Amino acid sequence: MEKPSTLLVHFDKGSAAMAGEIKADLEGSDVAAKVDAMKRAVMLLLNGETLPTLFITVVRYVLPSEDHTIQKLLLLYLEIIDKRDAAGRGLPEMILICQNLRNNLHHPNEYIRGVTLRFLCRLSEPEVLEPLVPSILENLDHRHHFIRRHALSAISSIYRLPHGDQLVPDAPELVERALASEQDASARRNAFLMLCTCAQERAVAYLLSNADRVAEWPDLLQMAAVDLIRKVCRSPNRADKGRYIKIIIALLSSPSTAVVYECAGALVSLSSAPTAVRAAANTYCELLSSQSDNNVKLIVLDRLNELRTSHRDVMVDVVMDVLRALASPNLDVKRKVLDLVLDLLTARNVEEVVLYLKKEVVKTQAGELEKSGEYRQMLVQAIHACAVEYPEVAGSVVHLLMDFLGDTNVAAAVDVVLFVREIIETNPKLRVSMIQRLIDTFYQIRASRVCSCALWILGEYSLSLSEVENAISTIKQCLGDVPFYTVSEEGEATDSAKPAQPVVNSVTVSSRRPVVLADGTYATQSAATEAISTPSVAPGSLSSTLNLRSLILSGDFFLAAVISCTLTKLVLRLEEVQPSMVEVNKACTGALLVMTSILQLGQSSYLPHPIDNDSYDRIVLCVRLLCNTGDDVRKVWLQSCRQSFAKMLAEKQFRETEEMKAKAQISHAQPDDLIDFYHLKSRRGMSQLELEDEVQDDLKAATGGFTKDAYDANRLNRILQLTGFSDPVYAEAYVTVHHYDIVLDVTIINRTKETLQNLCLELATMGDLKLVDRPQNYTLAPESSKQIRANIKVSSTETGVIFGNIVYETSNVMERSVVVLNDIHIDIMDYISPATCADVTFRNMWAEFEWENKVAVNTVIQNEKEFLDHIIKSTNMKCLTPPSALDGECGFLAANLYAKSVFGEDALVNISIEKQFDGKLSGYIRIRSKTQGIALSLGDKITLKQKGGS
């Protein structure tokens, strides 16, 4: 088929036989058969068939029919048939339908008139339309609004044709007159849109003359008015912008939520005045609370986030209104609300925000909400962020959050214990109460990771005599009686805490597999140490207070090593604060008994798997230390660990501060840019809003708010040459990548002395790319150029390729000439941007994502840090590993990189490299993602770039 088909429908019968049957049915008198025949004819035409002999039959036997269904199908048939010949001239037989269309325009039935007028909106042949214009104009005064509505649409369509102003020269005057007297909402909208498109001055005059009554207009007309205001105010330095802003503010009280939403967006685009921005923000907040559709809430939150980036000072005042959207049951909405609120925190509103979040935490505790565990985790993270930025609010929430250390949602419990660890270091005033609360609630903790962190806190921050003694006592209570098992006379191993209950069957078998540590390296540990859920043990083996014992009996020797280290620290601390050496020796003996019992359990056949070497060495070190303590070792154990943690927090705060400074120092305007001083302007007759708007415009000009950076000199560095200089047609393109589409601006130059006819840029794609526009033919004069724009839709981050040809004809050559274009490769770097996430989130995603691309390191670079910097620059990713962890020369480096795509996809990269004896680097770069495309594309990019190429 030569022409592109809009619809493909399979027919079992041949088209020739089908055409004969259609013709026979149309010539008959059976109305039902005619309807069926017309439907089949329309399907065949849409399927690419021509049916050239059918037109006369339709004119003779279908045009006179009075049946409404047949008339509707007839108009559809007339719309899709070819009305022009190969040379582009109108077919003479089209005149045959003019009389029928004129009769329909005077038909007594309103439906026939209306559908005929609607059909004329889709005609573009002046030969057919010209004799019908008087009849169309007569329908402007018809009593029925259905006919007037479509008559206005028909006039608008005709006037927009290339020579439409000659067919209906007085159309704007007629439509304006009709608009003044029209009462139907749809008809008024059609008339107003016609004026907006074809006679904008008349539309503006009508809008301004009815400015006081715009709020009473129907919502369809109000939407059209908002669109007109947007279009009119795009021109710079409009003196009457204040009048349009008043209209927009009046429309904010419209009962239509669609109008209100559009008005809020228009108001922000028209004015930077605080009053206008505040009105828009309040409108968005009202929509956020009144709309039940989650998609609407997400869209409104996006608009509020855009306001935050440019008008943060105004948005701070509506933070509590935004928080009310947490009432939505949707977690995505809650997450966006919390992210937005955290960016709007100030010393003035942080207490109110934390109080609200505290109430939400209590709701999750009461079980009132769905997915309360996930929601509680989000709330804990939000409160953590508030307390880090404003430490004075930590005291009001930390004790409430510590009740969730034993939460069944392990992720939420981990967030709580990390929050406690940071607050107890940064807020020394809360240390005493937090240690006491942790000791009181320690028995509730069921997750191994939470226990490990809580034990570290007890070991580092229990300073007074009572705190140290209580901490040791609590740990021993949670461990139960030692040794952990006894061997009976029959040789059967039993739990010493449950002498009558055999527990061999109650032990959870722990599988061993590699896990990802915080620095991105791999390590082997038992699955029980991950504590994804509460350990599964037999009934009777898990007591409410023996949480540590249960975890150790499940094979968690990593936790056992942490317990040993904590007891060692507490005994060393007790030596400093306890004057009685008898008590010190008693505590030391108890700690040694616990450690030796753990070693005995780990080396016995009681558990399916023995203790791992790392844990064994760690516990043995603790035993030796308690038996022979030196001052240097004591200093390392009691001071260095806490100092390292404090240093880590300080570095984290420093990095965040430096990032904020870097963002604040970006220059948006040049020193010699023009600034207008509003004090020198006349203020006579200006409202308060107009005065504010003038001030804000001047400030934006001074700070670069109006600067456009999308089109600059850097575009010249990205021009792609598509053909050679010796080709008769030279072509080059600039590729602009937007979020979901690619725009190709192609410049074509005719380098010959001949006119190129039917020149067509034919493009094709490979990958997840799709052409939006159909190719068009152009005529190119000798040595002239043509700009052609092609739009390509993108659906994923997979690497795509655009290829094609330029086809043209000349008068000297009968055949078409073809110039093959160079391929255009779409770079994944255009779709991903650096992002940041917590270490816990990174590890969870790493474990969850199934697609991994493993790239071997092959580079001429010999410095580990230099190679890492090169990969970061080449992949446009963010390094999550702190700089302090990368300092020094140890011959080994491990780092995590992270980025997000415009489609919301996560890209995770782990680099593990070491320096060989010959100075070369070896190792692997692992890429993980949820989809295959981004993993493969990023791997190809790294393979190409890692050798140090550009």
Swiss-Prot record:
Entry's Gene Ontology BP terms: endoplasmic reticulum to Golgi vesicle-mediated transport; intra-Golgi vesicle-mediated transport; intracellular protein transport
Keyword entries, A-Z: Cytoplasm, Cytoplasmic vesicle, ER-Golgi transport, Golgi apparatus, Membrane, Protein transport, Repeat, Transport
Protein species of origin: Oryza sativa subsp. japonica (Rice)
Transmembrane portions of the chain: none
The HEAT repeat ranges on this chain: 92-126, 127-164, 275-312, 313-350, 392-429
Domain of life: Eukaryota
Subcellular location: Cytoplasm; Golgi apparatus membrane; Cytoplasmic vesicle, COPI-coated vesicle membrane
Gene Ontology terms for molecular function: structural molecule activity
Record's function text: The coatomer is a cytosolic protein complex that binds to dilysine motifs and reversibly associates with Golgi non-clathrin-coated vesicles, which further mediate biosynthetic protein transport from the ER, via the Golgi up to the trans Golgi network. Coatomer complex is required for budding from Golgi membranes, and is essential for the retrograde Golgi-to-ER transport of dilysine-tagged proteins.
Stated name of the protein: Coatomer subunit beta-2
Record has Protein transport as a keyword: yes
A GO cellular component entry from the record: Golgi membrane
Subunit structure: Oligomeric complex that consists of at least the alpha, beta, beta', gamma, delta, epsilon and zeta subunits.
Nucleus is among the record's keywords: no
Membrane association type: Peripheral membrane protein
